[in-house]
Amino acid sequence: KCFVIMPYEKNLNEYYFTLIKPTVEEKGYNVTRADEIYGNRPIIDDITSGIEDADLLIADVTGKNPNVNYELGYAHAKKKEVIIITQNITDIPFDYQHRRVIEYCPQEGEWDKKLKIKISKTIDAVSGIV
């Protein structure tokens, strides 16, 4: 299972559904975000369960969203493998600046292909395939 942590914004939602989710699914993971979980529980319970149950997490920290940072901290406390991506390297929280981060820029040519390759190779690396 892969749980994705990210802000819910129009452009980022598009990137999730057209790029991130399909790329990770190609690697054999069942991919979900909290807004894809239906039920009557408090959303924070769905988020913490999603993080705890995941074998892999992807966190897009674009925009310094406080909810994303909270969830990233929770994943860190649970010692989860997290692939961090962002559109702006300065959005990386201080405590994570020592980590490898995938930076992407939607204004660059073929950015989507580059991001897909980087995510795919990183999944291989953290899964021990490479």
Residue locations for each model-derived region?
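A generic local structural motif
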Residues: 43-46, 70
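Defense-system signaling and execution modules centered on TIR/cGAS-STING-like, death/scaffold domains
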Residues: 1, 123-130
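Short, flexible, glycine/charge-rich loop motifs used to bind or transfer phosphoryl groups or to couple energy/partner
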Residues: 46-48, 91-92
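Short, surface-exposed alpha-helical recognition segments that flank or form part
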Residues: 35-38, 42, 110, 114
